[in-house]
C-alpha cells in the first residue's frame, strides 16, 4: 500500500466519515452514487421528473440538470449538498431523498452526511485539486447491482465495504470483546475517538438518569421527554447511527433497556434507551475484521479527513496522525514511538511531536478502528490499509498552538494517570463551551478525585446542587468546577452558592430539595470546599480568604493543571494523601511543579 504526500494551494474543511440523519440501510447510500451514473434509475428519475418537482429555482434546476448530463459527471460540494431552504431542494442529494412533514426533500445537513458516508465507503471519489466529486469503481459496481435488483449480491457487496469501514471495525471489536454485554449509546461514545480531543465527548449517563429520576419525582412528563430527546452529544448521535447500521446488517441486535437507578436514596425503574449487543453473524464479522480462523483480515479504508474533528488544530493533527500511519506501514514493525516522532519531526519540525503524543494518538487510532498493538513504547500496525493521500498546503507551516504545546509538555509529566484528562485543558481554554462540554469538565474534575486521588464521591451537577461531592474517612469536599477561558473570577454570587451548599451539607434538612448530600456519610470530622478551573482571575484570593473566614470552612482554588499534577504525584507516591489535602486546601493556586512549564510557553 502507499500513503502519498501531495501539495495543494489550499485545503478543504470538509468532514468525511460518520453520519447523522443518514439511513441505516446501506443500500440507500447507493442512491447517492447513482447520481453520477448516466442512465441509472435514479439519474433518469432526477432528469425526467424529480428535479422539476423539488427544485423551484429555474436557473438552479438548469444548472443541476446540466452538471449530471456532462461526461464525465463531476459535481461540486455545493451542487451535491446545497444550503438551508424552507421546503424545496437546492442540491442533487437533497432531491434524491424525500423530506419530512411539509418538506419536499431532505435538508442540507442530511445531504452533507450522506455525501460524507458515501465518500468514506469508497462509493465516491473526492478530488482535492478542484474540490469536486466523481463516482468510483466501487460506486459503479454498487449502482449496477442496485439497478439490476440483484439485492442479495448488493447486500454482500455492501457487507464487504462495511468491514473495510474502520468505524464499523471499531464497533464490531468493541461489541465482540464483550459479547454478553448490552451497550448504550453512552457506552459507545465513552470508548470512541481520540482520548484528549474535543469533539469526541459523550454525555455522562449518570446525569441522564438523574434527570429522568428528578422528572419522575416532579411528575413532569414533558421534562422527561425533553431529556430523552435532547440529552446526547454529537458523538452519541454518530454512535446511534453506526450501531443502527450494524443492526440492519444483522451484526447486532437492539432492544430498549430499563435499569434500576438509585437517586436521593430512592430506587427508580428508568428507561435507559436503546442498547446494542453483538449477534452470531457479528462474531463472524469480528473474525473477518481481525483476520482470525480461515478469514483474511479486511483491509481498512482510511482518509486524512477521518483523523481529527473540526477544531482549529485539526489540520496539524490530521497530518501528524497520517504521518504516523505512513511510517508504521513503511518501516519494519514493531517500531518505537520515539523513532516515529523523530521521523515526523525531521520532515515537519514545527509539529514538535513527542513519543508520548505518538502513543496517545495510537490509542485514538485504535478507538476509530485502526488496530495498532501498543507494547510499552513499541508499536505494531495490525491492520492493512488502502492507499490514501496526505494533503499538505503549499507554503504553509504546520504549528501547534500554545495549548497543544503545553499539553505535550504535560504528557511527559503525567506518567501514572490517564491522558484522557488532558481534554479538560481544551474545555477550560475554550471561549465558548457547550452544555455537554461544561458537564464533561465537571465530570472529569470529579473523576480525578475519585479514580486517581483515592476519594469516594459523585459528579452531581444540575440546579441547586454542587458540581461534585467527595469524601473519605476524614472529610467531605464540596466541589465547584468552572470552565472559564478568561479565568474564573470567583465573585460573591459564587461564594454565596458555595456557602449555601456548606450549610445544607452540615444541617442535612430533609425538607430542602434536592437532598444531594445524602450520598455521603454523616458525622465526618471536616467539611471542605474546592473550586476547580482552568485559571482564576480578578481578586479571587481576597474573595476566597474572606469566604473562608466568614464560613469557618477551609477550602481552596485549584487550577485544573494543578489537580492533574497532584493526582500524578499521589499515584507515583511522591505525595501522601495528607499532603494532597493540604495542597487542595491552599488558597494560593501557584504550584511549583507546573509554574516552570507555564513560563516556557508564555
UniProtKB/Swiss-Prot annotation:
GO terms for molecular function: DNA binding; type II site-specific deoxyribonuclease activity. Keywords: Endonuclease, Hydrolase, Nuclease, Restriction system. It holds the Pfam family FokI_cleav_dom. It catalyses: Endonucleolytic cleavage of DNA to give specific double-stranded fragments with terminal 5'-phosphates. It comes from the Bacteria. Gene3D superfamilies: 3.40.91.30, Foki Restriction Endonuclease, Chain A, domain 1, Winged helix-like DNA-binding domain superfamily/Winged helix DNA-binding domain. One of its GO terms (biological process) is DNA restriction-modification system. Its EC number is 3.1.21.4. InterPro entries: FokI_cleavage_dom, FokI_D1, FokI_D2, FokI_dom_1_2, Restrct_endonuc-II-like, WH-like_DNA-bd_sf, WH_DNA-bd_sf. The keyword Transferase does not apply. This is Type II restriction enzyme StsI. It comes from Streptococcus sanguinis. The lineage of its organism: Bacteria, Bacillati, Bacillota, Bacilli, Lactobacillales.
